[in-house]
């Protein structure tokens, strides 16, 4: 994806990467987190006030200052001195300007280094050790950005004995669950025909694999409550005392006895954490999902807007979410009332969990599938309605004489064509790990007349002479936005067609890109201007992010919209349809997305986009595969008054408006340009 210009950024790659890093950084997202800001501010006020009451000065160190916000809060709270450090140079330069524009340039000493590089002493980075540390070094896993090592270094070299630390402590919570939806993103299932006949069985090593070791961070509040069975209450499994170097260990284990509250198979652990911001624990910041959030019941009684669902009543943030950790594979159910031991482990950066297993090692993928494919791709492979629709169409158009070339990565549907009775299947698998996975499926299922090629160049003239059909789901691991799969399929298809001297049937026949105007409840905050934040002017940071975003970012980005609720403000709009067989031709389309209920809703702040694939020439719901909303939002239907339900196995496209659309406007103009040679679609919105 690129901007609405065909020209690539002309600077060097390092400069482009740096601009993109600034544009996509979470600095603005964190500053939009009003609860975080207010609770850091309150903790600073309480801490500095208490030190002064004890007759002590408050010398504050702010590690990773970002915008400079926490340092400015410390000055406002009465700190006697403030030293801030920021290693990311563009952000440090911006913080310097922000601090100066707020009249605090002479009150805050900004050092453009990592905290581990700071030196203490006369004429050095810090004149003296600090007795107050304020920092935000956390991610969804709490420790994934190296918080333990940073705190340990600061406590040893940069802080006085008995210093105050903000936040003071963190508690990690875990909840054991049975969650088929989460498991659909982890473990491939049997693939069956519409008659229930098994087409492909899954190799045991893939069923039993622990999966990817990368954190699975999600907005747990958006999981439907009916999609999981809580086998336990949330329990605290670890506490981190950020003021004690001795207590901050790089590796720990805890065994936690709990009573099963609901019968079921233990499949996963939901994890989150909270922060006690001050020494006395009077200020608490929780990252819990709504059903476990300490403020939820109180917020529910204050609810005034019926359009906001209960999961969105709690403070929203995207920089700290919750995480899912898969337990070692088990088919043994737990009984209600049974006592079990939840073993929790962490190293310097990550977590893992087990049941009744003191020696459990960190999980990693041993089968290759979780290395080759993302969790959402595994979800697509397990998507029953999608698979059924595609298989039904393939059963209609293929017969025992069909020789099918499959283009794409990890297509179990393509592989199943042989099990359906086709004469031969040829898979092109350019990714070595994906190719190994497909070979294991072939071997495990005893499939014959299946040829797996490492590249199209391996396609022989004899093989091409027999091809009757070319099929793609389509899916390619290189694609980010859903329609990029179809565009890559067209590119590969054109290469194959150059080798053919006869006509073949191509599936899918075409694809379309749709858009709808929406009001995001929270997602718009990741790019919305900050302006004033807790009384401080951050407009200079707004300007920096906007300038870099214009250069480095596409107007359409990928987001899993099932995690980010939005309300539709009008019917869906078909923006472009591309015939796959004729996809070598450039195409330009223009139009308007209409808003039929703009006056009812607070604001239009974005456009949601998705792709639909049409298997055959005659387009119908039966042969259409959508990566978009599950709700009907056409002109003939009444728009839903609740947030749209989205396909949770895809990331959709999102265009976020820098400023909400004016209330008087009832449409938004758009241009889509498909460039076949550059393999991309350009979008422009006015």
UniProtKB/Swiss-Prot annotation:
Top-level taxonomic group: Eukaryota
Biological process according to GO: peptidyl-arginine methylation
Record-linked Pfam families: PrmA, PRMT_C
Annotated ranges, domain SAM-dependent MTase PRMT-type: 5-352, 357-686
Gene3D superfamilies: Hnrnp arginine n-methyltransferase1, Vaccinia Virus protein VP39
E.C. number: 2.1.1.-
Keyword Repeat among UniProt keywords: yes
Described purpose of this protein according to its UniProt entry: Essential arginine methyltransferase that can both catalyze the formation of omega-N monomethylarginine (MMA) and symmetrical dimethylarginine (sDMA). Specifically mediates the symmetrical dimethylation of arginine residues in the small nuclear ribonucleoproteins SmD1 and SmD3.
Family, per entry: Belongs to the class I-like SAM-binding methyltransferase superfamily. Protein arginine N-methyltransferase family. PRMT7 subfamily.
Protein's recorded name: Protein arginine N-methyltransferase 7
Organism: Aedes aegypti
Gene: Art7
């Amino acid at each position: 994806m690129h901007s609405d210009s065909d020209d690539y950024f002309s600077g060097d790659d390092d400069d482009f990467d740096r601009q993109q890093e600034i544009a996509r950084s979470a600095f603005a997202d964190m500053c939009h987190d009003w609860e975080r800001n207010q609770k850091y501010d309150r903790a600073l006020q309480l801490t500095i006030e208490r030190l002064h009451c004890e007759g002590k000065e408050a010398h504050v160190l702010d590690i990773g200052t970002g915008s400079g916000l926490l340092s400015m809060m410390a000055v406002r709270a009465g700190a006697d001195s403030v030293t801030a450090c920021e290693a990311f140079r563009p952000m440090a330069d911006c913080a310097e300007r922000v601090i100066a524009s707020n009249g605090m340039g002479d009150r805050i000493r900004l050092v453009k280094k990592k905290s581990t590089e700071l030196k203490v002493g006369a004429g050095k980075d810090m004149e003296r050790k600090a007795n107050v540390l304020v920092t935000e070094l956390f991610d969804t896993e709490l420790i994934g950005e190296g918080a333990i090592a940073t705190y340990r270094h600061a406590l040893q070299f940069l802080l006085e004995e008995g210093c105050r630390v903000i936040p003071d402590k963190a508690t990690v919570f875990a909840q054991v669950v049975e969650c088929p939806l989460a498991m659909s993103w982890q473990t491939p299932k049997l693939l069956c025909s519409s008659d229930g006949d098994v087409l492909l069985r899954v190799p045991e090593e893939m069923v039993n694999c622990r999966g990817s070791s990368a954190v699975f961070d999600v907005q747990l509040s958006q999981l439907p409550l009916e999609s999981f069975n809580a086998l336990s209450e949330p329990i605290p499994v670890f506490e981190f005392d950020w003021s004690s170097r001795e207590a901050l260990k790089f590796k720990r284990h805890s065994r936690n006895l709990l009573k099963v509250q609901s019968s079921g198979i233990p499949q996963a652990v939901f994890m989150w954490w909270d922060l006690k911001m001050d020494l006395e624990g009077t200020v608490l910041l929780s990252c819990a999902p709504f059903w476990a959030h300490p403020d939820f019941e109180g917020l529910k009684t204050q609810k005034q807007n019926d359009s906001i669902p209960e999961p969105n009543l709690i403070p929203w943030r995207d920089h700290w979410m919750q995480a899912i950790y898969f337990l070692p594979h088990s088919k043994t159910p737990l009984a209600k009332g049974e006592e079990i031991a939840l073993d929790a482990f962490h190293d310097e950066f990550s977590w893992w969990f087990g049941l009744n297993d003191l020696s459990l090692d960190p999980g990693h993928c041993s089968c290759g599938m979780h290395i080759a494919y993302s969790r959402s791709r595994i979800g697509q492979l397990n998507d029953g309605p999608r698979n059924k629709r595609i298989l039904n169409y393939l059963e209609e158009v293929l017969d025992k004489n069909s020789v099918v070339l499959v283009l794409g990565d990890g297509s179990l549907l393509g592989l199943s064509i042989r099990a359906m009775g086709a004469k031969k299947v040829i898979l092109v698998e350019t990714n070595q790990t994906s190719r190994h996975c497909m070979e294991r499926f072939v071997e495990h299922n005893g499939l014959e007349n299946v040829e797996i090629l490492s590249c199209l160049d391996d396609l022989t003239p004899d093989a091409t002479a027999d091809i009757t059909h070319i099929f793609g789901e389509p899916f390619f691991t290189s694609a980010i936005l859903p329609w990029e799969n179809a565009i890559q399929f067209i590119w590969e298809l054109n290469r194959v067609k150059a080798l053919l001297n006869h006509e073949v049937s191509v599936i899918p026949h075409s694809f379309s890109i749709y858009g709808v105007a929406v009001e995001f409840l929270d997602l718009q905050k990741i790019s919305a201007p900050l302006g004033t934040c807790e009384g401080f002017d951050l407009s200079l940071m707004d300007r920096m992010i906007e300038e870099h975003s214009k250069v480095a970012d596409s107007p359409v980005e990928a987001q899993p919209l099932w995690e980010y609720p939005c309300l539709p403000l009008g019917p869906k709009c078909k923006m472009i349809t591309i015939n796959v067989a004729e996809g070598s031709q450039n195409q330009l389309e223009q139009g308007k997305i209409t808003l039929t209920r703009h006056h009812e809703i607070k604001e239009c702040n974005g456009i949601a986009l998705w792709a639909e694939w049409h298997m055959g020439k005659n387009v119908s719901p039966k042969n259409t595969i959508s990566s978009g909303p599950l709700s009907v939002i056409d002109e003939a239907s009444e728009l839903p008054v609740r947030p749209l339900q989205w396909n949770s196995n895809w990331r959709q496209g999102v265009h976020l408006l820098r400023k909400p659309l004016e209330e008087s406007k009832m449409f938004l103009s758009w241009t889509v340009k498909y460039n076949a040679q550059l393999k991309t679609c350009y979008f422009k919105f006015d």
